[in-house]
């Protein structure tokens, strides 16, 4: 199947500059293409993952992806999709983020992959202001720039000259990569359409209207309930394991709505059409088994964090479901309960009622006794119904933690003071 046909059935294409021309080109030869990311932070989140999954598909089809880290454009700020001006980062911060994102990309694509990393600071930093204005600014029509959504949406609230010129810098990126590496396709999110077409216009003005360059954007990802994909009550789901643990990452995918899961399987996994159709049938016939969600969680967690992290996430999930918390290792306890409320307790044995009230897990001694008597309190996975029980924090988890649950879902991680 042609790569464009595959992306079409996956629903992964939003807009194309020349659909027939690009399909013909990719059918006739292997091409070089690129997608960029600005180092506005030191990690990508799952929203960033979508275009780079597309890049991986091109690689698997034999094409040559280039990943552009915007060391220069990241110091300016992309106005796309924003209502307000970005805060400028220090160059030290930008360089720190460039290194972090480069490492993240290398983990995603693998060290032996046919993917090339580039940094636009290498060429944009060498262009003087006069050269920029003479060589590129002269070719860009202000009226055209003002008409693009990325600028037009900001005219009422205001946009700085710095951010206004961003699309010219991204256009120079496309031109430079086309000249130096024969890159013919740029991929980006739906909000990058204006920047991508600006680059194509610049190339056509310099090299001729028949120059074969293309642009393709991915759809804006919304959940079935209309809310933005990738956000939770706790914030963004990051690709960095230090920001979002593999267990939390795995659980995010496991908890997806039946209405969304098949679309996500198409976007975020490399499963074929037949297998995805089988999982779609399972969602219809046996939704309670959540087979599609399990497969989605497995595939994406393995791709982002690797096999070992996936197995650990599955192990933690299995233990928490069974309630046998004492089988968790210290590291797994920290990973499983990193987002639950934390409390501090002394290392000496303490009466259960006093411990629950002193840590504010229970609002009063009366409520604590009532919950204990009713079996609503578990300590390290064991139900405690004795209000006179003495709890020894040193008994489990090497004396470092105590896991307390009130009711069915309210977990607390008690950290034992040294």
Curated annotation (Swiss-Prot):
Coiled-coil regions listed: none
- What does this chain do? Catalyzes the attachment of tyrosine to tRNA(Tyr) in a two-step reaction: tyrosine is first activated by ATP to form Tyr-AMP and then transferred to the acceptor end of tRNA(Tyr).
Which organism does this sequence originate in?
Answer: Levilactobacillus brevis
EC number, UniProt record: 6.1.1.1
Alphabetically ordered keywords of this record:
Aminoacyl-tRNA synthetase, ATP-binding, Cytoplasm, Ligase, Nucleotide-binding, Protein biosynthesis, RNA-binding
**Domain S4 RNA-binding: start-end pairs:** 350-417
Family statement drawn from the similarity comment of this UniProt entry: Belongs to the class-I aminoacyl-tRNA synthetase family. TyrS type 1 subfamily.
Which is a Gene Ontology cellular component entry for this protein?
cytosol
- Protein name per the record: Tyrosine--tRNA ligase
Where does this chain carry the motif 'HIGH' region?
Answer: 39-48
Sorted alphabetically, the Gene Ontology BP terms of this entry are: tyrosyl-tRNA aminoacylation
SUPFAM superfamilies reported in the protein's UniProt record: Alpha-L RNA-binding motif, Nucleotidylyl transferase
| Motif ('KMSKS' region) on chain | 228-232
Which positions in this protein are listed as binding ATP?
A: 231
Q: Which SMART domains match?
A: S4
Record's catalysed reaction(s): tRNA(Tyr) + L-tyrosine + ATP = L-tyrosyl-tRNA(Tyr) + AMP + diphosphate + H(+)
Report the superkingdom from the record: Bacteria
